[in-house]
Design a protein with these regions (language model features):
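Bacterial Sec-dependent N-terminal signal peptides
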Residues: 5, 15-43, 192, 225, ...
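Long, intrinsically disordered, low-complexity segments
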Residues: 21-24, 53, 57, 61, ...
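An aromatic- and glycine-enriched ligand-binding surface/loop that stacks and positions planar moieties
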Residues: 23-89, 189, 197-198, 214-368
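Conserved, well-structured interaction surfaces
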Residues: 42, 46-50, 54-60, 83-163, ...
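C-terminal substrate/ligand-recognition segments
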Residues: 103, 107, 344-440
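Structural register within alpha-helical repeat arrays
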Residues: 145, 152, 224, 231, ...
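Short coil/turn linking the two alpha-helices of tandem helical-hairpin repeats
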Residues: 158-161, 165-167, 230-237, 427-430
Length: 519
């Protein structure tokens, strides 16, 4: 599946210059392409869409939107390990929900998300220009314009979730001194809903290699499902019936199903997953950016996986989250047994032969130089021990992997859709038998006993266990009213800290932006 997409993508990058800055609103997109030689077939439109999707490759790397989502939740953190990982305090701030408008992770997330919006705007503008000139058949262009508008709606879903109150920029042909004003979270919600309602019906329902890792009808429905599930947070009123309707279209299509093996979704070659509704098709050569081994593994873990580069020893999970998995849950794995795939690397760590324990002679850990990833973390800062914290092992680290993985990253996965529907049904009626059955599908695959009833804590915990490190946990905590509470290495915080600050550099450059409360 990935080969088809790379062929079209690379063709687009070869034909079209996409090297301009994301912040340059006046760039020329097709200055070397004649309209009478291009946009005559679906393949040519697909090639032109390449830039809209290449922005996504920044999703999973260190310092990205994904990183900020995860580290500001209860399932991941980056402790300061002596002289390592202080980084101006930005990761300590993120985990404590004490965000600073000047922190790089806040600024980089904003630039990443609006860079994606701007690329969609560029392409929409160019397509519409060619249509107005009579150079492109409007009927041929409509589904591709809808694809871009839906992708832009996804960028705005992430923006409204993370930053809350943001500008709505839906045009590319603006003045050089254009300074968009802040819109309320409810206004951004309404914009996303309108874009999806107008665009999703025009998207293809075909699910095969030609639509893999592209926005199709069911991706649009997944975006709607997430938007409506979080409507109470975003606009102050629930929309659970709409969330259920969106999930039903995906479920009843028959195009998706649970993989029998949970970890099939996270293998190096996972592009054939029956669960993937929309994924980022990473590749160690052609589509780099998935840097997880560098981000989470201990320096000596290079010997476990025969990695080409030494990892950075940063990201880890927390004891409370790790212990939320019961023993026997296939997602938890077995401490000290690296031969068994798991969401975590925990316990004794070994060389690639599986027999010789890794040794860290400079270790500051009380249990000596033998490398042991302990769930308990001795300190958030300044001297977290080098081996403290179980590491993120959910995605397969291939033997001799480079810093860039070839695993595709799921943005929307069928298991998530089942849990979205279950939650929406439960919120309408806490005793709903269908909600319980949906959650138990997930638990059965994980090898744990079915629930006999559902509580809010059950739902939140099961979402956490299933969707670990897929960039939804912070949003889930907010929706369940748990984000503000005190937890390990985080004090109790005000509700206004549920969203991130607008970066100081953006406010300095645009007087029409308003800072979020609390900052």
């Amino acid at each position: 599946m990935k080969k088809y997409w790379f062929k079209a993508l690379l063709a687009g990058l070869f034909v079209i210059a996409f090297n301009q800055s994301c912040s340059d609103l006046k760039e020329t997109l097709y200055d070397q392409v004649k309209s009478d030689e291009f946009f005559k077939s679906d393949d040519e439109f697909i090639a032109a869409l390449g830039a809209a999707y290449t922005n996504l490759y920044g999703f999973e790397n260190h310092g990205s939107y994904m990183a900020l989502q995860e580290v500001s939740s209860d399932e991941a953190m980056i402790p300061q390990r002596g002289g390592d990982w202080y980084d101006g305090g930005q990761w300590l701030n993120a985990h404590r929900a004490e965000f600073n408008p000047q922190d790089d992770n806040v600024k980089n997330s904003w630039l990443f998300l609006f860079g994606g919006v701007n690329t969609c705007n560029r392409l929409i503008f160019q397509f519409n220009k060619l249509i107005s000139e009579g150079a492109v058949d409007p009927a041929l262009a409509t589904p591709f314009l809808s694809e871009l508008r839906t992708l832009r709606a996804l960028w705005y879903l992430w923006l409204v979730d993370g930053f809350g109150n943001v500008p709505i920029v839906d045009r590319f042909d603006v003045a050089a001194d254009f300074k968009p004003a802040t819109k309320t979270r409810a206004e951004v919600y309404a914009f996303i809903e309108k874009e999806l309602n107008e665009s999703v019906p025009n998207l293809p329902k075909k699910v095969d290699g030609s639509t893999y890792a592209r926005i199709n009808y069911y991706t649009g429905k997944a975006i709607q499902a997430k938007l409506y599930l979080n409507a109470q947070v975003y606009k102050g009123a629930p929309e659970f019936d709409k969330a259920i309707a969106a999930t039903d279209e995906i479920i009843n299509s028959g195009n998706y199903s649970l993989e029998s093996n949970y970890f099939s979704n996270f293998n190096t070659d996972n592009s054939g997953s029956k669960e993937f509704i929309f994924a980022i098709p990473y590749d160690k050569v052609n589509a780099q950016g998935f840097n997880l081994p560098q981000m989470t593994l201990h320096y000596t873990s290079q010997q476990t996986f025969n990695l080409t580069d030494q990892p950075w020893n940063g990201y880890c999970s927390l004891a409370e989250f790790y212990n939320s998995y019961q023993d026997g849950d296939v997602r938890k794995g077995v401490s000290g047994n690296q031969a068994i795939r798991a969401n975590f690397l925990a316990g004794k760590q070994f060389q690639s032969n599986g027999k010789d324990q890794l040794q860290d002679p400079s270790a500051d850990d009380s249990d000596g130089p033998g490398v042991v990833f302990t769930p308990e973390i001795n300190a958030h800062f300044p001297n977290c021990q080098r081996q403290a914290g179980v590491r993120i092992g959910k995605f397969e680290f291939a033997n001799k992997a480079t810093p860039n993985l070839s695993n595709d990253f799921p943005i929307f996965r069928y298991a998530d859709i089942l849990l979205v529907k279950a939650e929406a049904l439960w919120r309408k009626s806490a005793g709903d038998a269908s909600a319980l059955a949906l959650v138990n599908q997930i638990r059965t695959r994980a090898g744990v006993a079915a629930f006999t009833s559902l509580t809010a804590d059950d739902l939140l915990a099961e979402r956490g266990r299933e969707m670990f490190f897929e960039a939804w946990r912070r949003s889930d905590l907010v929706r369940f009213g748990k984000y503000d509470a005190k937890r390990q290495w985080k004090p109790a915080t005000q509700p206004c800290k549920q969203v991130w600050p607008i970066p100081r550099s953006q406010i300095d450059a645009n007087s029409n932006l308003k800072q979020n409360p609390c900052y």
